[in-house]
Swiss-Prot record:
Pathway: Porphyrin-containing compound metabolism; protoporphyrin-IX biosynthesis; coproporphyrinogen-III from 5-aminolevulinate: step 2/4. This is Porphobilinogen deaminase. Its EC number is 2.5.1.61. InterPro entries: HemC, Porphobilin_deaminase_cofac_BS, Porphobilin_deaminase_N, Porphobilinogen_deaminase_C, Porphobilinogen_deaminase_C_sf. Binds 1 dipyrromethane group covalently. Keywords: Porphyrin biosynthesis, Transferase. The modification S-(dipyrrolylmethanemethyl)cysteine is found at residue 240. It comes from Xylella fastidiosa (strain Temecula1 / ATCC 700964). GO terms for molecular function: hydroxymethylbilane synthase activity. It catalyses: 4 porphobilinogen + H2O = hydroxymethylbilane + 4 NH4(+). The porphobilinogen subunits are added to the dipyrromethane group.
Length: 305
């Protein structure tokens, strides 16, 4: 029986996502023996500093990529929003699965919406993109960094450390925690991270056998949408150091891409959106990035450099 080993982080959410990929692979190839290879990453272990301060979201990938290079794993499963815009050789995105809910969720045990939070309420999120949008809509809020797995973050809310926190809807749904969502923060008013809600599988470019197996998981509409989002972010030189949001969707007549660049310090947001009848997400991504730059995003990006 052929064997496929999936490198994964050890968190409950990462394990759920990897088990989901494994189950899909077993359905596609019933004679395939799929096993998980759980491991810790530096991004999971260093929780007292922001991701921007310790090197960015690539810290969630490094150990998993090393496992593939050593021959200890054949592929790795990630939340696509955590995958750097440019994967260095010899790695590639072998599959992007059908997207789950791309929105963020406001979670509070007392208040029912972002608007109903009291003046000066304490809201926690580690994402600069979320902080910038919170600052835009509610400049009075006190914002705090919050890292750790989903249950750790919920526990801090439940302990009274904060009045509300912001998490990704997809992660909550995958863990069966939909009931904790107080309000969805969703497009067009609120934009997610590029690729948010999608699961990605990374493999070695040179491994054609694994690449062929994983290609059966790929959802082409999702891949095209996230290509547009990630191309926009790449054109802006975006990273976890920069508050960038993007969301692409198929509508009658073609693909629509909405993008924003924000500033946490003063809550400024620069927005742009375009529709394209051509099925070329990379061109649309570059076009929206240029619109953002023309509208003043260059100044905000320079402030974060």
């Amino acid at each position: 029986m052929p064997l496929l080993r999936i490198a994964t982080r050890k968190s409950l959410l990462a394990m759920w996502q990897s088990e989901y990929v494994a189950a899909r692979l077993r359905m596609l190839c019933p004679d395939l023996d799929v096993v998980l290879v759980p491991m810790s990453t530096r991004g999971d272990e260093i929780l007292d500093r922001s991701l921007a301060a310790i090197g960015g979201k690539g810290l969630f990938l490094k150990e998993l990529e090393l496992a593939m290079l050593r021959g200890d794993a054949d592929c790795a499963v990630h939340s696509l929003k955590d995958v750097p815009m440019d994967l260095e050789p010899p790695f590639m995105l072998a599959a992007v699965l059908s997207r789950d809910d791309p929105a963020d969720a406001l979670i509070s045990n007392v208040y029912l919406s972002l608007e109903s939070l009291p003046i000066g309420a304490r809201v926690a999120t580690s994402s600069l993109r979320r902080q910038a949008q919170l600052r835009f809509y509610r400049p009075d809020l006190r914002l705090f960094d919050l890292r750790g797995n989903v249950n750790t973050r919920l526990a801090k809310l439940d302990n009274g450390d904060y009045d509300a926190i912001v998490l990704a809807c997809a992660g909550l749904r995958r863990l069966g925690l939909e009931q904790r969502m107080t309000a969805r923060l969703a497009p067009p008013e609120w934009l997610p991270a590029p690729g948010q809600g999608a699961i990605a599988v990374e493999s070695l470019t040179e491994d054609a056998r694994i690449g062929t197996l994983l290609a059966g998981l790929d959802d082409l509409p999702t891949r095209k949408c996230v290509i547009a989002e990630r191309t926009m972010n790449r054109a802006l030189h975006g990273s976890c150091h920069v508050p960038v949001g993007a969301y692409a969707s198929y509508e009658v007549g073609g693909m629509r891409l909405q993008g924003l660049v924000g500033c946490v310090a003063d809550g400024r947001l620069v927005r742009a959106e375009l529709c394209s009848a051509k099925d070329e997400g990379d061109m649309l991504g570059r076009a929206v990035a240029q619109c953002l730059l023309d509208a003043g995003a260059a100044e905000l990006l320079a402030a974060t450099a």
